Amino acid sequence: MRARLDHMRSISRNDPRQYDDLADQWWHPGGGFEMLHWLAEARAALIPPAARPGAVLVDAGCGGGLMAPHVAGKGYRHVGVDLGRTGLRLAAQRGVEPVNGDVAALPLASGVADVVAAGEILEHVTDLPGTVAELSRVLRPGGLVVIDTVNDNALSRFITVTAGERLGFAPPGIHDASLFVRPRRLIAEFARHGVRLDVRGARPTLGGLLRWRLLRGRPTRGRIVPTGLTAVLYQGTGRKDRERS
């Protein structure tokens, strides 16, 4: 473990190779990606059952496919797009159709998706306008986009990077705080492509965080719950205008 952490510290922040180094953590109970499981469950709860046969859910930045068990019964063809091949292999084992690609240049046809989910990925992209344009492009008119990401301010940087890494809630170097995105900016970017995004704050339960910290390597049953404050973590949903192609 120490050798792996030393290697991660030797590469730049937000380097996608870190996810390959941490591949064994995707489905490790109580491991380094534990909170991503909570976020995936909360994200999936915002996705309604498929409204038509053959409906497509595009999971942008799917990682190891953590949303799969939470959307499996909703009637979607679950397509996961990610740069990390190791994570995609794990996602495929859980029923996700894997596509190796960049969320800023999705290798998918326009209007293919009934739902686009972009969870814990927007704070990692270096081209936010291009990424939002691509997420909107593959969404069919009337389709739903679901996001969660990290706000850009001093508090979010302290909690997510400084305290989060020090306390073991985030792998070292996994975030580059300069890429965090404010809700109003994200709302404006989606609006340019005919998607009206509504956002709300979200936070992990305190009990879940404490159990995760104290019971490393064991399931913690933590949850993400809504809050009125978007200062650190927030979720968003929006529909694409039916007139937009």
Specify the residue positions occupied by each region the protein language model found.
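Conserved SAM-binding loop
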Residues: 44-48, 55-157, 236-238
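Short, flexible, mixed-charge acidic loops at enzyme active sites
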Residues: 156-165, 210-216
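Acceptor-substrate binding/catalytic loop of class I
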Residues: 149, 168-185
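Soluble or luminal CAZymes and related metallo-dependent hydrolases
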Residues: 11, 38-43, 127, 178-182, ...
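N-terminal, positively charged/glycine-rich alpha-helical extensions of SAM-dependent methyltransferases
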Residues: 2-27
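Feature marks short, surface-exposed loop/turn motifs that line or immediately flank catalytic pockets
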Residues: 25-26, 153-156, 203-207
